[in-house]
């Protein structure tokens, strides 16, 4: 098992001077519901998962970081006062976290490190956030007397993406990786950044990701267009309701009133977002009553909205969603920005093997390749293991 301390430790010992350091881990995440709501000031509902990154870190008494990626069998060194980030993209994350921690007053010194992960790259489980959180947590512990609070650690990861990796992401992935809690999902208000834990211990159900292994190249331009649609709808609504800042402040009635000033396409996009923000709240209410049937129903509604109104699904994901429905799966939807990636499924224990078998078989028959299946369990956030 990759996430075992011994797995990383044996390679750390072999690669460096035979001594051992401290071991840290951080998880990837799922988002149960609340998709494309973050940039509309709404809610997201992530949870940390039992897959992630694990790293051994040991100060080396120099000003140089020596980093080894166990998975890629790649080695990089950089000085802590160098301005230029390393070329290897994985090393940029570590470099960026070092710079961001130094900016926040942590006296980071050189260290040796080796890391590995079992968050699959590209399946939308935020492997990069897991890597950032692992090192932010480690540097805070080893060099910062743990004086940087958890929220700031999440921001370190976000700033790393922005400043060193060219990704203009929100805070959700890093937040979930740092604040994750076993058996709980986190409702995060993307405007105020207030958060609340909700119990998620679905007895008799399993949470399964089915990865379509497709990535459609449209994604970034389409994503920007969706944002513009939302902004256009807000601008039209503001004429009558000047206090409105985001679609989060709107209901369907306000959108209907402004219909004449909104293009048909922008109207559909806004309708999806307004409904999706409400669905997050409905799912939280359902979880407080352990009503997983309602949770599942809302997941299907989200998929329908993402497919028909927001139009960010694709043939493969719609196929997997229909298949889940036909198998009697409790809930299923596309997870992440869309245009590929995976579906997240809430499956009754007794249906599990039938569903997985069918998903593999039918998908392969139609698309001539096999989907990947990942079972996930909601787990703890960034921590020191030993």
Regions from the PLM with identified roles:
Residues 46-48, 56-59, 105:
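Short, charge-rich binding segments
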